Amino acid sequence: MSAWRAERVVLAAIVAAAMATPAVAAPDTYDPARYRVVLEHVTARRTELGARYAAARSGQARAAIRNEARRFVVETLVSQVFPAWMGMPSGGGPQATASLPHEPGMYISCSYFLTAALQNAGLVLESRARFSQAPAAWIERALLPPGGQIHRYGNLSAGELEQRLVALGEGLYVVGLNIHVGFIVVRDGHAWFVHSSYTPPGTVVNEPLTSSMAIDLSRRKGYWVSPLFQDDRIVELWLRHQPVPAPPQWKGVWSPEPGSL
């Protein structure tokens, strides 16, 4: 069973009361028309940067454009995409696969939130379903270049984990937990966990990592952390509008043992 499916089992026990209610309306702060403008800007910016990248004639020029694209994607995710998804109800089943924030009648699971956010920021995925239904570490490996490192931290408190993440450097990361996956943003000496939470309040949240129930619940099994948009491969794929190859189709039986993600 993948993290996506295992999460649903725990979700029923932890937030049954919350999930018994219908999907809530989009918060007043979410403006669908404004978000469409954000998505259009992402497309236009990727097209403009991609054209410049294709025309660049030196390695130095290409590196500068990659860095410009990297900054744009990360800042767009943090300042535009993540805020738009806040409050979207978490859930399971075929209604948990929303592609845009606050789609009427829809929920969002942890891995489908991760893939939707990446797609909203202009990243093309070979198969959203295969990404979203794979174990967390498979998702991370697919987003990393060949040989890219997944940092494994075992039995650390949330405070200790935050210290390790801050030591890795500011930026965006993917974290796999025992039955969960999400984003981590490291800025100004602190780490924030952005995810579709299977713990209360049962919505997409941006919370301090040190106070996250989902982080605490994974302490015994550990945490798997990988950098996102910090290597040239994924930035080049974004610039060229080329798909990130998907993980293999997951057909195994999920196990919570360390490394099984």
Locate the predicted segments by residue:
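Initiator methionine at the very start of the polypeptide chain
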Residues: 1-2, 25
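Bacterial N-terminal signal peptides that target proteins for export
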Residues: 2-11
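Bacterial N-terminal signal peptides
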Residues: 10-18
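N-terminal signal peptide c-region/cleavage motif recognized by signal peptidases
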Residues: 20-22
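N-terminal capping segments
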Residues: 25-132, 257
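...with weaker cross-activation on analogous glycine-rich loops/strands in unrelated enzymes
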Residues: 133-206
